[in-house]
């Protein structure tokens, strides 16, 4: 059985970690380097840094944060936010990142996935997908012909990919996009449910399972973690390979080690 990974996520704004709900209402959660050291000591398998403001003038801040973190933490570090070119990949990797996460730039210029994977290797290229349920009122709608429709407890829906930090819908079906990024050379998918983000009500298992089933890539489930049962569900029912979480760790509701011990009780292999 493949070992499942537990990955704390640090959303970084102007050099500080922040956390919100449904991508809004951001609260300060601490210093990224200090939190990274804590999660490393608690047994995190990897870390994800997402520079959520990522405008050009903030780029130097994230590079500095990555450098300082990489000097003190020795687990794989994925960095994303505002990365648009192969040169951006190179700068962040040189600063100490192990993988680069791209979202908006992947949608806008899909060939970046191919180019980066050929230069740096597929293991370096993580495609992040911010996904929202799009509920259907008319199942006969002509516009649904190229969409994968799911029956959920709240009605029929398809899953839409969003860009620019969840601010803009693309009309792209998440399942079809996942297949495309795999073909282009992505090595992993970081899959965030915008509906579940920050709610602590559990991961969107319909979404996670559907993406897992339709690609051969490792899937990191993200959005909605509130307790260890949610993580177990993401692994068992959602078929995820890794689980990302933020709030429950940042606000000391549990530790990475606490989560792993509970997960192991459910016969799921984790690194303790």
Curated annotation (Swiss-Prot):
It catalyses: 5-[(5-phospho-1-deoxy-D-ribulos-1-ylimino)methylamino]-1-(5-phospho-beta-D-ribosyl)imidazole-4-carboxamide + L-glutamine = D-erythro-1-(imidazol-4-yl)glycerol 3-phosphate + 5-amino-1-(5-phospho-beta-D-ribosyl)imidazole-4-carboxamide + L-glutamate + H(+). The active site is at 11, 130. GO terms for biological process: L-histidine biosynthetic process. One of its GO terms (molecular function) is lyase activity. Disulfide bonds: none annotated. Pathway: Amino-acid biosynthesis; L-histidine biosynthesis; L-histidine from 5-phospho-alpha-D-ribose 1-diphosphate: step 5/9. Gene3D superfamilies: Aldolase class I. Pfam families: His_biosynth (PF00977). Its EC number is 4.3.2.10. SUPFAM superfamilies: Ribulose-phoshate binding barrel. It comes from the Archaea. It is found in: Cytoplasm. Belongs to the HisA/HisF family. PANTHER family: IMIDAZOLE GLYCEROL PHOSPHATE SYNTHASE HISHF (PTHR21235:SF2), IMIDAZOLE GLYCEROL PHOSPHATE SYNTHASE SUBUNIT HISF/H IGP SYNTHASE SUBUNIT HISF/H (PTHR21235). HAMAP family: HisF (MF_01013). Heterodimer of HisH and HisF. This is Imidazole glycerol phosphate synthase subunit HisF. It comes from Methanococcus maripaludis (strain C5 / ATCC BAA-1333). The lineage of its organism: Archaea, Methanobacteriati, Methanobacteriota, Methanomada group, Methanococci.
């Amino acid at each position: 059985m493949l070992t499942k990974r537990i990955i704390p996520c640090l959303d970084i704004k102007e050099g500080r970690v922040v956390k919100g709900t449904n991508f809004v209402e951001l609260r300060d959660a601490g210093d990224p380097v200090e939190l990274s050291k804590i999660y490393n000591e608690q047994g995190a398998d990897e870390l994800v840094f997402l520079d959520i403001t990522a405008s050009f003038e903030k780029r130097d801040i994230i590079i500095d944060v990555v450098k300082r973190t990489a000097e003190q933490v020795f687990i794989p570090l994925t960095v994303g936010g505002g990365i648009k070119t192969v040169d951006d990949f190179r700068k962040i990797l040189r600063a100490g990142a192990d993988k680069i996460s791209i979202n908006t730039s992947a949608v806008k210029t899909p060939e970046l996935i191919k180019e980066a994977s050929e230069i740096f290797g597929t293991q370096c290229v993580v495609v992040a997908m911010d996904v929202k349920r799009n509920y259907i009122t008319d199942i006969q709608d002509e516009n649904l012909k190229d969409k994968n429709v799911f029956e959920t407890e709240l009605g029929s829906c398809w899953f839409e990919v969003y860009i620019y930090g969840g601010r803009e819908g693309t009309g792209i079906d998440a399942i079809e996009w996942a297949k495309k990024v795999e073909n282009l050379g992505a090595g992993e998918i970081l899959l965030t449910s915008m509906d579940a983000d920050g709610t602590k009500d559990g991961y969107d298992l319909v979404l996670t399972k559907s993406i897992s089933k339709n690609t051969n890539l490792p899937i990191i489930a993200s959005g909605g973690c509130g307790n260890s049962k949610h993580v177990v569900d993401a692994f068992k029912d959602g078929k995820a390979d890794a689980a990302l979480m933020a709030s429950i760790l940042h606000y000391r509701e549990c530790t990475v080690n606490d989560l792993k011990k509970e997960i192991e009780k459910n016969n799921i292999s984790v690194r303790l």
